[in-house]
Amino acid sequence: MHPGGVESVAALPDQPIHGVVIANELLDNLPFRLAVFDGGWREAVIEAAADGSFSERLVVAPTEWAWLPLNAPHGARVPIQQRASEWVADVLAQLNGMLLCFDYCTALTAQLASIPWRDWLRTYRGHERGEHYLRNPGEQDITAQVCLDQLPPPSTVRSQAQFLARWGIDELVAEGKAQWAAQAATPSVASLLMRSRVSEAESLLDLAGLGGFVAVEWTSPHVT
């Protein structure tokens, strides 16, 4: 649930944005199209059957996808993330400040063509991995690894661990340890919260977990 004073809206405000826009795991959730290599690149479109089930059908890929790699393993798949690119561009067009996105990212689309597609096209249900993306529509989240080469060029790309270190997480942990040590004999709720900074930081900085997320920054002076 949102804290008080926070309002959910369907679109960006129709006015300049001065400050910082933060998007946490947004880009991977935006709708994407699916390219499949079958001797050449094709687009997988979804068809609905009379019984309500869904299946894929391959059609000729749009000519604007000519930037895809000329060759790939048979059956390779990659996401086409036009909506994510448009969202970033829309924010930057209104922004005087910084856009900061945290997400699962890959530098090049071609990298995804060489790995099993279910490693990057993921579904989640109840915070657990879900089933095939065509099953249980509306009951599971469908996400895709974000391909940075499909987005407007960012100003800075760092791991989440590097980003947090850059902005002082080590100092916050040291402060938490010091306050806990000073009050360990008679702990309070406040001191327990300070102690929890240690384990929370370990989780946020773990490169095999959350620390491996990518922090992508764009700075935009477009609006004055």
Question: Residue ranges of each PLM-predicted region?
Answer:
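SAM cofactor-binding core of SAM-dependent methyltransferases
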Residues: 1-18
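Generic detector of intrinsically disordered, low-complexity, polar/charged segments
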Residues: 2, 16, 49, 165, ...
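Serine/threonine-rich low-complexity intrinsically disordered regions
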Residues: 5-8, 23, 49, 61, ...
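A short, conserved alpha-helix within the catalytic core of class I
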Residues: 9-12, 27-42, 80-90
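Conserved acidic residues
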Residues: 18-19, 97
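A mobile, often basic/glycine-rich helix-loop segment
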Residues: 20-72, 114-125
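Long, Lys/Arg- and hydrophobic-enriched amphipathic alpha-helices
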Residues: 64-224
